[in-house]
Amino acid sequence: MLERDDIMDIVFGGSFNPPTVAHFRIAKKVMSAYPSAAFYFLPTGQAYWKEGLIEDRHRLSMLELLCRRLGPRSAVSDIEIKDKKYAGTYYSLRKFNNPVFVLGADNLVGIETWINFPAVAAENRFVVIPRAGVDIEAILARDSLKKYRDNFFILDVEEISASASAYRNTKDDKYLLPEVAQYIKENNLYKE
């Protein structure tokens, strides 16, 4: 059981390309659910195999804007950005105190393909954010995951549909906090 008074670092990983209103709302909800925990955004670096990431410095700056709104318990970690070779979530989490990793149910779908699976599932705790069309319990009942079921906690949160890809496809500022939208305009980002 993930106790609310555990001293822990909650780590929210992702590309944050760009960070959206959904990322902010998820962070706020998780921080509210675990008021004694430190909260870290963990953006992936360029060594990660995701294409189309804007420069790390811009993603870090935009995440700092989210942290200003979230308050002093939140911070941005640049450990994966500093890594020249992506080593995976397993090794990143080892750098935090009693870590709990936040992931969307859409990312839970492929957890068996993560570097260092099953160790990452066996040795860590996770807060899973529901996503439309993803049956979290069915995933956690898979043979490869069911013995780690107690390490996964499903956060009761309303459906938030504001993905970074939706912003990149539409350039609609409704997906962003105003200060992030302003930063994007000032720095001429996501023009393609």
PLM regions: where:
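Nucleotidyltransferase catalytic core that binds NTPs
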Residues: 1-192
